[in-house]
């Protein structure tokens, strides 16, 4: 960070005149010219602000300047990052800065240069984190307030403390902020805040998180593999199809059935087991990875493709212009991009989405394909699956993952590879794997029966779009289920007869009772797996009590 040079007092009038002569719409602002007396004294005593929230994508033309001018520069940093550095530059020695901005820079990779700058050039006094609280209308910004004191670039002074206070997300406007911070804030050693992601947890919780790291092995090392992205199609409309389209393509050309694979959306990846909804992906691998008949046909490749898979060629031909315009494509315009790990989609795997509202890691041992919003771990390790779905790991992920909209967690592979998984004893591993397999089977059975019920509603009563309430029918009473079915039937459909309504509620009772019993069995299995995973971490009774007392939102098996 380079502080602006001081300007000789004799030049102040000329600077003021020059600054005043700038056009009214000029974007230039020279702090030396505007405040020469202040800058001559070393800067401002206080800088307070609410910097504009301009995303990095809009900064393209300015990035070369920002890179050359700001030590806090990062290629994907938003504009407020540079306001922080500029604010520090404008402070006099021991002056204070306080901004309200998004809290994402505290943990995000793009915040590392700024965090390093604060560690080297400032002394943090307070951090107030509002999380998902709606401080600003119509803006989901995850605000935080930071108060820092500017200090010269010299070795850190003796250890000092930062006052940290997470502010309740509900009704923040009703709080007396001063009183709340005084009563609920806690001191955190300043030494915690360097270039690495900043934790705002209390010292006791941070110690617990440290125990998990000490007693765990990074997930990628534990399972011996790294996660892979799903497939980037470049044009989902061309490659992702429903059952009706698949059936027609195969009717026209039975030979294409082998290249049409089951496809999962992110919303179909449930806790323990994926819930396939009858969707499909046309997997035309790149000729760079697969020996298609047209692989080396040059100008004749499309003709060979048309002869090999006539129905697929016809399907793709209508979208040729958009397919050719893709960045993500194979050697030929109808192919998917090059990918050297297609095989893992057909093998046993743990899968999850990149956005998690709840721990929903799933296992599949059959062929399933995904797009790039999902991650695939090519492993059959059911202990790892149970650990990833466990309360203790959710507590860890909540405190270390990047948070997104509505406080969903962003499970990027750069983060999940580092999740600390405890190495279990053979006895713990065996018992956890047995229970994980049982939870998988219960989940799959419920999914199959749910599919049966929804298919019956579609064929018998015309319910084409069941919606979330019918998909979670076991949570409804018989009357509520019947009312929802009536609401979801086509407009103009005849009213249901008393006999049909009785059949409907009887069917619901039969399926719901079985689903509720399986859910209770699974909860019992999960409680035992949770206890076993905690044993693997060798947590003390006090640490276990702390884990549950400080449980984050949506903790599975919350007590």
Question: For each of these PLM feature ranges, what is it?
Answer:
Residues 1-33, 40-46, 58:
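Basic, amphipathic N-terminal segments
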Residues 375-418, 425-428, 433, 437-442, ...:
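Basic, amphipathic alpha-helical recognition segments used for DNA target recognition
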Residues 145-147, 263, 351, 376, ...:
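Conserved hydrophobic/aromatic beta-strand scaffold that supports enzyme active sites
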Residues 192-379:
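Polyanion-binding catalytic cores of nucleic-acid enzymes and NTP/SAM-utilizing transferases
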Residues 191-199, 213-223, 311, 422-559:
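Non-catalytic DNA-recognition/assembly elements of restriction-modification systems
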Residues 51, 55, 91, 95, ...:
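A generic secondary-structure signal for well-formed alpha-helical elements
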Residues 30-254, 258, 361-374, 385, ...:
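Signature of N6-adenine DNA methyltransferases within the class I
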Residues 130-135, 336-340, 404:
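Short, solvent-exposed loop/turn elements at beta->coil junctions and helix N-caps
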């Amino acid at each position: 960070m380079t502080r602006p040079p001081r300007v000789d007092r004799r030049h102040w009038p000329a600077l003021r005149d020059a600054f005043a002569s700038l056009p009214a719409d000029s974007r230039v602002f020279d702090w030396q010219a505007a405040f020469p007396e202040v800058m001559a004294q070393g800067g401002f005593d206080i800088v307070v602000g609410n910097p504009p929230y301009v995303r990095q994508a809009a900064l393209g033309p300015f990035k070369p300047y920002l890179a050359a001018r700001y030590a806090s520069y990062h290629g994907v940093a938003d504009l407020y990052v540079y306001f922080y550095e500029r604010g520090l530059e404008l402070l006099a020695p021991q002056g204070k800065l306080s901004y309200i901005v998004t809290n994402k820079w505290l943990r995000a990779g793009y915040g590392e240069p700024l965090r390093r700058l604060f560690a080297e050039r400032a002394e943090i006094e307070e951090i107030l984190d509002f999380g998902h609280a709606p401080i600003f209308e119509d803006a989901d910004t995850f605000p935080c307030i930071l108060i820092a004191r500017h200090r010269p670039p010299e070795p850190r002074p003796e250890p000092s403390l930062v006052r940290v206070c997470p502010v309740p997300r509900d009704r923040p406007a009703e709080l007396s902020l001063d009183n709340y911070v005084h009563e609920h804030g806690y001191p955190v050693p300043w030494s915690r805040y360097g270039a690495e992601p900043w934790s705002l947890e209390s010292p006791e919780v941070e110690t617990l998180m440290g125990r998990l790291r000490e007693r765990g092995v990074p997930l990628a090392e534990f399972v011996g593999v790294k996660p892979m992205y799903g497939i980037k199609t470049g044009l989902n409309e061309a490659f992702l199809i429903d059952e009706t389209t698949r059936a027609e393509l195969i009717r026209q050309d039975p030979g294409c059935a082998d290249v049409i694979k089951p496809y999962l959306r992110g919303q179909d990846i449930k806790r323990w087991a994926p819930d396939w909804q009858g969707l499909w992906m046309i997997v035309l691998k790149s000729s760079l990875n697969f020996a298609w008949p047209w692989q080396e046909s040059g100008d004749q490749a499309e003709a060979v493709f048309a002869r090999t898979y006539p129905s697929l060629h016809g399907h793709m031909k209508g979208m040729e212009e958009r397919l050719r315009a893709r960045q993500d494509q194979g050697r030929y315009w109808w192919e998917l991009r090059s990918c050297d790990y297609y095989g893992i989609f057909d093998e046993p795997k743990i899968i999850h989405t990149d956005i998690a509202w709840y721990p929903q890691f799933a296992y599949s041992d059959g062929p399933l394909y995904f797009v790039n919003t999902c991650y695939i771990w090519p492993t059959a390790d059911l202990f790892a699956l149970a650990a990833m779905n466990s309360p203790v790991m959710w507590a860890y992920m909540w405190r270390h993952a990047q948070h997104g909209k509505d406080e969903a967690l962003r499970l990027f592979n750069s983060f999940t590879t580092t999740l600390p998984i405890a190495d279990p004893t053979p006895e713990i591993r065996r018992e956890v794997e047995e229970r994980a397999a049982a939870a998988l089977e219960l989940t799959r059975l419920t999914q199959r029966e749910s599919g049966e019920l929804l298919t019956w509603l579609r064929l018998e009563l015309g319910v084409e779009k069941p919606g979330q309430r019918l998909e979670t029918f076991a949570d409804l009473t018989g009357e509520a289920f019947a009312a929802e079915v009536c609401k979801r039937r086509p407009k103009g459909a005849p009213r249901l007869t008393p006999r049909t309504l009785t059949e409907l509620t009887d069917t619901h009772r039969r399926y719901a009772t079985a689903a509720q019993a399986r859910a209770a069995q699974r909860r019992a299995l999960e409680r035992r797996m949770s206890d076993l995973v905690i044993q693997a971490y060798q947590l003390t009774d006090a640490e276990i009590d702390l884990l549950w007392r400080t449980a984050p939102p949506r903790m599975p098996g919350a007590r």
